[in-house]
C-alpha cells in the first residue's frame, strides 16, 4: 500500500482528524445545573461586565481558529473551501500535538477579501488567536494586515511567517557551518508569493544587506513588469544593484539560495556558479528546486528541503505551535517582528554549536524542547 493509499484509507476510518472532547462531565442533575443552565449564567454575567474574563471562564484562552479559503492549498492550488478541510484539520492536530493549543478548522466558502475579513472579525470573540492558512497572494497580505488592525488578538499567516522563521533559523546555523555572515552574504530568494515575500522581509530585518528576489520571469527589480502591490514594495528594498536577467544570472556569485517556487529549476551549473560552500534551501514540495545530492555534487555545502526524507528539513511545525502557545499564555495582542526574530534565534539555538554540521542545522520536529523554547522566546517580548 502506498502512502497515498494509506492516507486515504486512514482518513476514511477517522471521519475527520479532530473531535470535541468535553472537559466537564455531566453525570447528574447537579452537573447539568453547573455546566449549563442555570449555573452557566454566572460566568456569562461576569464576562458581560468584563470581556477580559472570557480568558478565565471560556476556551478562548487556549484556542485558535485555523482559517482558510482553500485558494492556495499545499501543492494543490485553488481547490476551494471544502477540499481544504483535511489540511485544516491536520493543522489543528499539529497545534494540539506539538503545542498543546486547541484549534478549530474554519474553511470559508468565499474568496472575496472583504467577506473573509468580515467573517474572521465576526468569529474572533470565540478565539485567542487567528492562524490564516493557504490563502493566495497577494490577497493574503491585505487580509492579514487588515485583521491585525481590526483585532486585539494575534493574527498570523503561517505560510508567510512560519516558513520565514524556520528558514532564518536554518540560515543562522548554516552560516556558522560555512563561515558566512549576514553583512556580506549575497542571498537569492526564488518565488515572490506569500512565503518568498515574508522570507525576504525577515532576512532584511535580521540584517542581511544583499537580497535579490526572483520569480518565473527572472530577477525582480524596479523595472519589472506586472508586479502586484506587495512585490512593488519589495523591489524598493531588494536587488540594490538593480540586476536584470534570469535566475541563473542571479545565482552567479551568490552565497545563499532560498527556493519557494517550482521543482527542478536549479541546475548543477547554477550551483557551481555560486560562491564556495553555498547554502541552498530548496523547499518546493514534493520535488525540490534541486535534489540535495545534485546540489552537493555541484559544490553546495549545506542543503535543506521541505522533505522529511532528507537532512535539514525546513518544517513550520517547529515554529507555529510554540509561537501561539507563547502568545496565548502571555495574552499577546499581536505577533511582532521582534518575536519572529527571537523565535528564529531560539530555534537555531536548539542545535548546540558542537553538534552543528552540514546535515544538522535545525532541530527535529519531534524534539520535545521546541514548543516550550519557542513559547518562552515569544513571552519574553510581551
Residues of each region from the PLM?
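Rossmann-like adenosine-cofactor binding region
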Residues: 232-302, 307-309
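General beta-strand structural signal in soluble alpha/beta enzymes
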Residues: 105, 131-134, 155-158, 189, ...
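Short, ordered loop/turn segments at secondary-structure junctions
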Residues: 69-71, 79, 108-109, 134-137, ...
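Adenosine-phosphate binding glycine-rich loop
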Residues: 158-159, 282-382
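Glycine-rich phosphate/diphosphate-binding loop of Rossmann-like nucleotide-binding domains
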Residues: 74, 81-99, 157, 165-262
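N-terminal ligand-binding/catalytic initiation module
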Residues: 1-153, 375, 381
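Solvent-exposed alpha-helices and their adjacent loops that cap or buttress functional pockets
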Residues: 55-60, 96-97, 122-124, 148-149, ...
